[in-house]
Amino acid sequence: MKIDIHAKNVELNDSLRQLINNKVSKLNTFHNQIINTDVYLRNEGESLHSNEIQIKLSVRNQTLVAKETNESFEKALDLAVNSMKRQLKKIKEK
């Protein structure tokens, strides 16, 4: 699975990049036909929930999207990955 990370108004350090790669690559265990994944990080200001992560995942002929905001990118990533797991399980059951 190919993972592309895009950051807007965010300084993407190596530890955050590694965390994203580790967590998102584990989604392969829930569906083995994931083609590619785009992860978008965005910081929209100084508010409490201004850190946003969006995961866009291509599976066969479908595109799945999970979008979460939180005070930290790590928490937003956990929420988005959990949301994506649910979507992948639902598709696999069909």
PLM segments and residue spans:
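N-terminal, polar/charged subdomain of small-to-medium soluble alpha/beta proteins
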Residues: 1-94
